[in-house]
């Protein structure tokens, strides 16, 4: 029994092993397939590589899945170099995982010619040195003179490797054992940086309970995939050709599992694909649909207990419900958070001179943080660095989302820890011995932020010919640095589709979606299910936790939605029959009929944020072609709750929503109260009655809402002053009267 303040789970591994599994016995008689891969450096998220005397080193990284082995590996470099470099002395060294692979000579270029073509060099690398995570490093050795007096940081020392350079390799599948101790590999591999694509297999269209189990599992895999993204194709009664998940009860097995032993309870099992033997199937089995949900909960909460090939989930219990805003990927709002709590690997907070890399931290904030008239987000930064030996200017620059925030001078006393505190936008002193307090302006804080700290060490020279050897300086951001949002309240104007698209709000206020109702059509299509599973994966990606407590209903089902935020998904005609009577719905789609209500200043992207514009136009038309919409409005069941509808004119058009969810750039365009999506563009509408969710202290609440009505605020201020003046006058009159009375004989 595994217990904590959140959950309890009991898993029985090994003891439960169905008897007849001969058809799925291990063994790989056929030859393992070999596949070829080709990536440009740009596809590996690496732009042009610029090497110089100041920064002679740079690298690219690539990964290898746990179920594959590299058989051949090569790179084809397209590069150019400074014509000042001497051929006999200059070259580029190429390393694979710090093992020297090749020395690439640099051929001289003539000064009196214009060079427009890149040189090309193919290099074979040793595949046996490949690991799960790999680095190819390039080091420039550049000389421009035979003279003993040479400036190694001279601007004429440079070479550039083009982003169209190519990495090629051939890989062969490995025969992995079917063991839960490896899980979630090979279904999800942390060393695979591509989008996770994991098919969900059913015998036929699943019912609501089976759909819920699959959605929970999708959100769990989405949390694992994180920034990679995830999609979950839906397959009916067909054996997949890749790693896949199969959900089946004893009465709803796919044909390829008909002879498989019946489950004796909630069961999780890994087997080899009977036709594609190097692929695996994750079986989620049960006597009924309730068992499927329990099995999925066992994966989400009790995975460390699972070993062997099969696990029978005896019990999953929730000892304490989750609290609001406790999503693992969100910055905690109940206390200050150490930088050490935000890192993904031990050396993330340090960097070395010459590496051309900075310290980066991802910070997600609750989308409804109330930043009105705040002084910003407080950060106490502690850092250390190798002290410079001269007074040459070295700096530490801080940026947020690629926007410069503040710079610090690195003084010669940097061997000790320096605490920096300041307030943006005030300029700070360069005296690093002083305590300084700084804050990130609230308007720069988005749902997802990247804090970047870049140490810039200056080159130390003594005279024209003497330059200190680089590469020895180190900069460290202390893991005891803190960031604190505990003094912020939670209050936000709704509907706000940007908060939904970027943070899943309001549903993700509770990471397990315990106060969310998801409404789906009674006979969902494959694409509707696939969109639901992709959306569930997005919730998991945002919070880092599966949607274990979300409630699922059919759109025509009687349900108490009073205390729920509602998510509607499906074909527009099925959904609008339930919601089109609500006056807050500004977009209506029914087959070829399209209707939209807009404000007078609809073309202004921030018009909605400035005022509640009244409807100025209403357009109703008939048109064909793919169209989908995401619409937000106040819940008709509870004024403090929200409804978000994801709908399409036809079921096939739901792929527009799914593609938008999977595309980070497309998702960032979802804003306002309604978003209309066609094959080429995203259009936002900002019309709708504004309402607020959350809470504020009474005084702040009054002043915040009065600030939207300056004339009323001025009148109330004047009345307040008059009342205070009258009260003070009465007090003074009373005191004067008493003084006169005491002076009389």
Regions found by a protein language model. Name each.
Residues 3-4, 10:
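N-terminal signal peptide c-region/cleavage motif recognized by signal peptidases
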Residues 14-745:
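Solvent-exposed alpha-helical segments and adjacent loops
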């Amino acid at each position: 029994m595994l217990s904590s303040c959140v959950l309890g789970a009991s898993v029985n591994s090994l003891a439960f092993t169905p008897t007849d599994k001969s058809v799925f016995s291990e063994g790989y008689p056929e030859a393992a397939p070999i596949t070829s891969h080709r990536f440009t450096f740009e596809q590996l998220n690496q732009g042009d590589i610029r090497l110089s005397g100041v920064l002679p080193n740079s690298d690219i990284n690539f990964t290898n899945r746990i179920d594959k082995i590299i058989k051949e590996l090569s790179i084809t470099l397209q590069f150019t170099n400074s014509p000042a470099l001497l051929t006999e002395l200059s070259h580029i060294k190429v390393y694979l995982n710090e093992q020297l692979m090749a020395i690439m000579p640099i051929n001289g270029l003539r000064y009196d010619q214009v060079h427009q073509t890149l040189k090309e060099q193919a290099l074979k690398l040793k595949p046996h040195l490949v690991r799960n995570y790999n680095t190819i490093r390039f080091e420039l050795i550049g000389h421009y003179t035979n003279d003993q007096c040479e400036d190694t940081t001279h601007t004429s020392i440079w070479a550039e490797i083009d982003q169209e350079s190519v990495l090629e390799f051939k890989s062969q599948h490995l025969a992995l054992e079917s063991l839960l101790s490896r899980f979630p590999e090979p279904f999800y591999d942390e060393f695979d940086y591509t989008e996770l694509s994991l098919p969900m297999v059913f015998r036929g269209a699943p019912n609501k309970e089976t759909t819920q189990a699959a959605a929970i599992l999708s959100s769990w895999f989405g949390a694992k995939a994180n920034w990679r993204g995830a999609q979950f194709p839906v397959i009916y009664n067909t054996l997949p050709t890749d790693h896949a998940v199969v959900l089946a009860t004893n009465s709803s097995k796919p044909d390829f599992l008909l002879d498989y032993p019946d489950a004796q309870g909630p069961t999780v099992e890994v087997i080899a694909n009977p036709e594609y033997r190097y692929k695996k199937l994750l079986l989620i089995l049960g006597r009924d649909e309730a068992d499927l949900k329990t099995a999925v909960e066992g994966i989400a909460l009790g995975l460390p207990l699972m070993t062997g090939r099969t696990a029978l989930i005896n019990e999953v219990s929730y000892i304490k419900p989750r609290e609001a805003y406790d999503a693992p990927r969100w910055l905690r709002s109940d206390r200050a958070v150490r930088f050490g709590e935000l890192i993904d690997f031990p050396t993330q907070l340090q960097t070395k001179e010459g590496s051309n890399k900075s310290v980066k931290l991802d910070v997600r904030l609750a989308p409804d943080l109330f930043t009105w008239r705040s002084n910003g987000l407080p950060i106490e930064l502690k850092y250390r660095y190798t002290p410079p030996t001269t007074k040459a200017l070295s700096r530490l620059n801080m940026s947020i989302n690629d926007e410069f925030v503040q710079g610090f001078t690195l003084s010669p006393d940097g061997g000790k820890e320096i605490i920096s505190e300041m307030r943006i936008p005030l300029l700070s002193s360069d005296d690093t011995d002083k305590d300084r307090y700084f804050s990130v302006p609230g308007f720069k804080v988005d749902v997802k932020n990247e804090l970047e700290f870049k140490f810039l060490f200056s080159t130390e020279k003594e005279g024209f010919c003497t330059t200190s050897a680089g590469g020895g300086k180190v900069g460290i951001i202390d893991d005891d640095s803190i960031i604190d949002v505990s003094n912020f309240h939670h209050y936000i104007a709704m509907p706000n589709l940007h908060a939904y698209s970027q943070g899943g709000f309001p549903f993700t206020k509770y990471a397990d979606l315990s106060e969310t109702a998801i409404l789906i059509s009674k006979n969902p299509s494959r694409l509707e299910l696939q969109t639901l599973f992709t959306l569930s994966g997005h919730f998991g990606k945002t919070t880092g936790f599966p949607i274990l407590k979300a409630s699922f209903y059919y759109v025509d089902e009687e349900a108490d939605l009073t205390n729920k935020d509602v998510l509607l998904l499906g074909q527009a005609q099925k959904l609008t029959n339930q919601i089109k009577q609500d006056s807050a719905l500004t977009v209506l789609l029914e087959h070829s009929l399209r209707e939209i209500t807009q404000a007078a200043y609809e073309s202004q992207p921030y018009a909605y944020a400035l005022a509640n514009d009244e409807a100025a136009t209403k357009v109703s038309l008939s048109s064909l072609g793919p169209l989908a919409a995401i619409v937000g409005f106040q819940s008709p069941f509870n004024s403090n709750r929200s409804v978000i509808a994801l709908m399409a004119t036809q079921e096939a058009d739901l792929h527009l929503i799914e593609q938008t969810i999977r595309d980070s750039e497309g998702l960032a365009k979802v804003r306002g109260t309604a978003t209309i999506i066609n094959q080429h563009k995203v259009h936002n509408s900002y019309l709708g009655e504004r309402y607020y969710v959350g809470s504020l202290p009474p005084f702040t609440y009054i002043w915040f809402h009065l600030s939207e009505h300056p004339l009323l605020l001025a009148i109330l201020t004047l009345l307040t002053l008059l009342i205070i003046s009258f009260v003070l006058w009465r007090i003074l009159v009373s005191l004067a009267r008493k003084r006169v009375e005491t002076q009389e004989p």
